[in-house]
Amino acid sequence: MVLNEKDMELLKFKENDVVVKRVKLSTGEFYAKYCNIYEAFMELLGNKVFALSGIKCPTYHYIKEAYCVISDDVRKYDTYYHPFDLNMNGYTLRNVKGKLCDSGLFSNMDEINFQIDVMHFIDILFSNIDRHISNFGFARREDGTGYLVVYDNADFLTQFDKATRPMSIDGADSLSFVFTAKEVEAREFISKLSEEEILYLLKIYEMFSPIRLVTIIRSIEKENNIKLPDKLDVFKKYLKNYLMVGKLLKERGKIHKK
């Protein structure tokens, strides 16, 4: 993307600017979000994963000189409501109150919960391995519409997932934490899971195989001229564990099929 001096000036965030702003550049109309290089990577990762998950959304671009991530020209989209309705938070997962049901993006709770677990899985694998498992919640209103709510205060969310999607494991707000469990814990957790939950986790595992995850990271680095080698280091550190959990899930899945 070629930007001129005037474009760069418009992209610069001033002290009183909101975190996300709409800007008219020489090449089109865009959304821009202020972020440092680490936050930018997580935005780009989130955007890429959304696209791979089949969610239609404008592609992000990292503008290093302006400390921001910008969208594609939004005028070329007839309708778009994601992830900009989430204020371009991608997978930084901070202070997000995204209108998912209201947008009509998902038609049922299972799909919403699947997306929540995918978000959680990517976040704990690449962002903060020690993050508490209770980061996501879904609240319904009386009229049937609802909001996905994300907070860092884990205790606040305990009520949400249990109310919308009962788990076989007591205290589990999201199944995706299984992917970071050590072998003894993983075996214990997985032995308690129902067939539905096993298939659910296998769906996530197959969507984001180790090779595919590395490919995603490298494509982000190449497309945006952004290099964060620690992301691959973190992934390699947990790769053996991730493969082990995948193997356990597949073994358990075969038992259920018999």
Describe each model-derived feature in a short phrase:
Residues 59-65, 132-141, 255-258:
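Short alpha-helical "patches" and their helix-cap loops
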